[in-house]
From Swiss-Prot:
One of its GO terms (molecular function) is rRNA binding. One of the primary rRNA binding proteins, it binds directly near the 3'-end of the 23S rRNA, where it nucleates assembly of the 50S subunit. NCBIfam families: L3_arch, PRK04231.1. This is Large ribosomal subunit protein uL3. PANTHER family: 60S RIBOSOMAL PROTEIN L3-RELATED, LARGE RIBOSOMAL SUBUNIT PROTEIN UL3. The lineage of its organism: Archaea, Methanobacteriati, Methanobacteriota, Thermococci, Thermococcales. Residues 324-346 are annotated as: Disordered. GO terms for biological process: translation. GO terms for cellular component: cytosolic large ribosomal subunit. InterPro entries: L3_arc_euk (IPR045077), Ribosomal_L3_dom_3_arc_sf (IPR044892), Ribosomal_uL3 (IPR000597), Ribosomal_uL3_arc (IPR019928), Ribosomal_uL3_CS (IPR019926), Transl_B-barrel_sf (IPR009000). Keywords: Ribonucleoprotein, Ribosomal protein, RNA-binding, rRNA-binding. Part of the 50S ribosomal subunit. Forms a cluster with proteins L14 and L24e.
Length: 346
C-alpha cells in the first residue's frame, strides 16, 4: 500500500471564522518609535491601479524598472477630538481620564450618542489642566489621541468613525505636549507618515456569507463515483466514533469573509494631496478615466500602498508603522515612479 498523504486543509490559526465585531478594525499592539508622532492613520479604500518604478530594494532587480500593483486609499484629514491618559493598573494599563474638545462637528453626534452637555471652553481648559497635573506628578504612563474621520469632506457619507491612536516616543511629557498642541485640530497623513516606509494594514475583509467546506477550507471535491450516491462538495466524514463528538478542527460550512485581518510590511509608495500626485515635476490626477469603480473621484489626500489591501471599496482602512519589519528593507524615501496607469478600470 502506498503512503497515505493528506495534508491539513486550511489554517486553524484564524478560528473561529466568524464575522468581525465591528467594521472599524482595532489595533492592540503598537510599534516602538523614537519619533514623537501619531502612530498611524485611517482612510477609505478607493481601488487599485498599477505603476512602473525604479526598484530601490535590495535584490536582483535593483536599479531596474519594475511593474508594481498599488492600492489607493483616500485619507481625508483626521480630527483630534480628545486625549486619553492611561495609568498602570494591577493587570496592565487602565484608563485614568479623558479630555474631549468642546467644539465638535454636528456629524459626530451621529456616531457618539453620549456627548457631554453644557460642556464649554472653560470646562475643557480645566480638564486639560487637571490632566497636565497628573502627567507632571508621574501618575500617567501613556497618552493617546482620540480621533474621528471626516468622510463628509470626500462626499462619502456623514457618520464618522472614531478610534484611538498611540503616540511615538518614550517621554510621557513629550507625548502630552504633542497631544495638547493637536487637540481640536486636523492632522493630515503627510504629517505622521513617511513616503517609502513600511506599514501594517488592518482592515475587515470582504464578506462572502455562508460558504461550503470546499471554498471555505479548500478540501477536495469527492471522487466522481462517490458523488453518485449524493453530493460531492462535502467532507467524507465528520470524524471517528470516539470521542463521540465532532471536533472543532473538522472543516465545515459556515461564515466566510468579513474577518478582521492584519497584513504586515506593505510599503507606502507615495502620498498625494487633493487627488493629485507629483510625477516628474508635474501634477497629475490619480483618478482613472471614469473614476474608480463603485467609488468615484479622489478629492482629498491619498496613500499609494504597494500590493493589495483587505476589504471592499469604501471600507475603513487603518495603517500603522511596521511592527516587525524585515532585516533587508527598502530605504525610507519615495521611489522613482516613471508611470502611473490612469486608464479606465470599468
Amino acid at each position: 500500500m502506498g503512503k497515505v498523504h493528506r495534508p491539513r486543509r486550511g489554517s486553524l490559526a484564524f478560528s473561529p471564522r466568524k464575522r468581525a465585531r465591528s467594521v472599524v478594525p482595532r489595533i492592540k499592539k503598537w510599534p516602538k518609535d523614537s519619533e514623537v508622532r501619531m502612530l498611524g492613520f485611517a482612510g477609505y479604500k478607493a481601488g487599485m491601479t498599477h505603476i512602473l518604478m525604479i526598484d530601490d530594494s535590495p535584490g536582483l532587480t535593483k536599479g531596474k524598472e519594475i511593474f508594481v500593483p498599488v492600492t489607493i486609499v483616500e485619507v481625508p484629514p483626521l480630527f483630534v477630538y480628545g486625549i486619553r491618559a492611561y495609568k498602570q493598573g494591577y493587570l496592565g494599563l487602565e484608563t485614568a481620564t479623558e479630555v474631549w474638545f468642546h467644539e465638535l462637528n454636528d456629524n459626530v453626534k451621529r456616531r457618539i450618542k453620549t456627548l457631554p452637555k453644557n460642556y464649554g471652553e472653560e470646562d475643557f481648559k480645566a480638564k486639560l489642566g487637571q490632566l497636565e497635573d497628573l502627567v507632571n506628578d508621574g501618575e500617567i504612563v501613556d497618552v493617546r489621541l482620540l480621533v474621528h474621520t471626516q468622510p463628509w469632506l470626500i462626499k462619502l457619507k456623514k457618520k464618522p468613525e472614531v478610534m484611538e491612536y498611540a503616540i511615538g516616543g518614550d517621554d510621557v511629557k513629550a507625548k502630552f505636549e504633542y497631544a495638547k498642541e493637536r487637540i481640536g485640530k486636523e492632522i493630515r497623513a503627510s504629517e505622521v507618515l513617511h513616503e517609502g516606509e513600511l506599514l501594517d494594514v488592518i482592515a475587515v475583509t470582504k464578506g462572502k456569507g455562508t460558504q461550503g467546506p470546499v471554498k471555505r477550507w479548500g478540501v477536495k471535491v469527492q471522487f466522481h463515483k462517490a458523488q453518485r450516491a449524493g453530493k460531492g462538495r462535502h467532507i467524507g466524514n465528520l470524524g471517528p466514533w470516539h470521542p463521540a463528538r465532532v471536533m472543532w478542527t473538522v472543516p465545515q460550512a459556515g461564515q466566510m469573509g468579513f474577518h478582521h485581518r492584519t497584513e504586515f510590511n506593505k510599503r507606502l509608495i507615495a502620498i498625494g494631496e487633493n487627488g493629485k500626485l507629483v510625477l516628474n515635476g508635474n501634477e497629475i490626477d490619480i483618478t482613472p478615466k471614469g473614476g474608480f469603480p463603485h467609488y468615484g473621484i479622489i478629492r482629498s489626500d491619498f496613500l499609494m500602498i504597494e500590493g493589495s489591501v483587505p476589504g471592499s471599496f469604501k471600507r475603513i482602512i487603518r495603517v500603522r508603522p511596521a511592527i516587525k519589519p524585515p532585516k533587508k528593507k527598502p530605504p525610507v524615501e519615495r521611489p522613482q515612479i516613471t508611470y502611473v496607469s490612469r486608464e479606465s478600470k470599468q
